[in-house]
Amino acid sequence: MQHSSFIKRTFLGVVALTIVLGLLIWGIGPNVIKARQVDLLYLGQQHLILVFNSMALALLVGIPGGILLSRPCARRWAEYAMQIFNVGNTLPPLAVLALAMVFIGIGDKPAIIALFLASLLPIVRNTYSGLCGVPASLIEAANGIGMTKGQRLRQVELPNAWPVMLSGIRIATAINVGTAPLAFLIGASSYGELIFPGIYLNDFPTLILGATATALVALLLDIALAGLGRVLSPHTAE
């Protein structure tokens, strides 16, 4: 049942994507897309570079951070620590970009730092929540068969927390992809190079092209992550 439900949702997603692409081509015209084909490919590559680099940093910091905070000795400090990890979401994205530009300069590096901060909280919080939500009976069973703390974490806690962790990663990725166009304002290449000139010049087709490309990247990455969840946890991933 779960397998057929997943196939049905995937099919409906592909149909919806096809309809959106058809409406896009009809609305702005194939000539605009053809004229911007090189820009779409190049800016898409640059957009993904920003997303992948910043998400890699967020995963390297967020997952260990969530694991550490989920340990019994650290749980009382968890909510205080979450406020620190939340700095990228508390401040407006433009303010984070501006601060990063002041300290680091312009280009990809400040953009990656700002996107890293914006993506951090969902990963930390969902890792923490997923690990704290592992049934106590499983923990007791692992202890009962003589597992060490490391073995228990790797073989019991993380596999059971994975669906919740993946949900946080998907949320963080969507935030990251949607925020990345703002990096254009501090000299980093992304689909913002289509969106913001489209706004300034009242060039509606270029604006829609950049916004739609950004939305499609977010959708495709989310589908890929959902598929990864099905592979790694076929009985629980959604």
Regions found by a protein language model. Name each.
Residues H3-F11, I208-E238:
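C-terminal transmembrane helix and the adjacent membrane-cytosol boundary/short C-terminal tail
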Residues V61, G65, F85-P93, I113-Y128, ...:
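Faces of alpha-helical transmembrane segments in polytopic inner-membrane proteins
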Residues L117, K149-A183, L209, A213-T214, ...:
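Transmembrane alpha-helices
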Residues N126-G168, Y191, I195, E238:
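Short cytoplasmic-facing helical segments at TM-TM junctions of multi-pass membrane proteins
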Residues Q2-H3, I19-A56:
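Periplasmic/extracellular loop-to-transmembrane helix junction in inner-membrane transport proteins
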Residues V102-F103, T179-T214, S233, E238:
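Glycine-rich helix-loop "coupling/hinge" segments at transmembrane-helix boundaries
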Residues T10, Y42-L50, S54, M101-P122, ...:
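Loop-to-helix entry region at the N-terminal start of transmembrane alpha-helices
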Residues L50, G65-A100, I123-G133, E140:
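Cytoplasmic-entry segments and transmembrane alpha-helices of multi-pass inner-membrane transporters
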